[in-house]
Amino acid sequence: MTASIVAHLKLARDDFTLDVNLHLPGRGISALFGHSGSGKTSCLRCLAGLERAASAYIEVNGEVWEDSTRGYFQAPHLRPVGYVFQEASLFPHLSVRGNLTFGWRRVAPAERKVSLDQACQLLGIGHLLDRRPATLSGGEAQRVGIARALLSSPRLLLMDEPLAALDSPRKREILPFLERLHDELDIPLIYVSHAQDEVARLADHLVLLEQGRAIASGPIGETLARLDLSLAQGDDAGVVFEGRVVGHDPHYGLLDLRLPGSSGPLLRITHAAQVMGSTLRVKVQARDVSLALAADSASSILNRLPVRVRESCPAANPAHVLVSLDAGGNALLARITRFSADQLGLHTGQILFAQIKSVALLG
């Protein structure tokens, strides 16, 4: 059976109703994304059992945690969940080591998924073990909080805007550690955020919430490229790719990335040498993609890809058009002027060349 997380939740309050049907991958990072008040935290609290929905069915990789039709509700302390809040909320009277081992000692040795040494290595906190929480920076405290959640040996890790209370330098400090959790641990993670840059960098699967409803859910690359969603209308609209390193030009400092799919195109980016076959995540902004009827070999633009027009729609700025493109099975977005669209004779199914002016490496 395919690993998956299923949650059907209905929760009514005086001023808010949550009504979602979630089907998420049972591994990797799934992001719940939306504005404040859209229902992101309510979803997490229901999954953890901290909020009891009027109607609920929750199943995590084959194990039922809640089924209101049968009157079954697994108590919060019995759910194998690690919960990371905006604030680390460490025990102030214990050292970092004491905070980490508090829950870990209560897990049977045979059930432990992560060792103390492994958690310290993953989060880079080995040098903090003898410190008290009051002496930690915000970023250090949050890393300790994440390690503490891991050491409870959860089957599901929930993170509720773990970077929201941190300034930009501390956010940049923690993001690489979250990427390591994704790469090195086989624990599914549901990540709540309203920051699109965090989601683009971390998530494999994206759920867009609006007013208590899940209006979109799918792989992050495809979901970011949907023209019917508000995500495509923002100034930072774009798509995310995970490319495999297939070449390196040390003279010019260029990497060749092969995008997914049997006919996945090649992207060239400026970057130091990487291990051949390794995977890198990149983002291409819609504003950095122009379209042409033919490949221009005289251009200084490195990346010129043959593409097929999927669809187009008006952009938020009435002078522009958003264009959804297929690049060898990969979704790509372009934002061009209406004048340019008319000059190209833009239509569905048309074969064009996408000229990508900039590719941003995430991480």
Curated annotation (Swiss-Prot):
For binding ATP, which residues are annotated in this chain's numbering? 34-41
Known EC number: 7.3.2.5
Q: Which ranges carry the ABC transporter domain?
A: 1-236
Q: Which Gene3D superfamilies match?
A: 2.40.50.100, P-loop containing nucleotide triphosphate hydrolases (3.40.50.300)
- At the top of the EC hierarchy, this enzyme's class is translocase
Which InterPro entries does this entry report, sorted A to Z? AAA+_ATPase (IPR003593), ABC_transporter-like_ATP-bd (IPR003439), ABC_transporter-like_CS (IPR017871), Mo/tungstate-bd_C_term_dom (IPR008995), ModC_ABC_ATP-bd (IPR011868), Molybdenum_import_ModC (IPR050334), Mop_domain (IPR004606), P-loop_NTPase (IPR027417)
Domain of life assignment: Bacteria
Concerning PROSITE patterns, the annotation shows: ABC_TRANSPORTER_1, ABC_TRANSPORTER_2, MODC, MOP
Q: Record's family?
A: Belongs to the ABC transporter superfamily. Molybdate importer (TC 3.A.1.8) family.
The protein here is known as Molybdenum import ATP-binding protein ModC
Supply the source organism's classification.
Answer: Bacteria, Pseudomonadati, Pseudomonadota, Gammaproteobacteria, Pseudomonadales
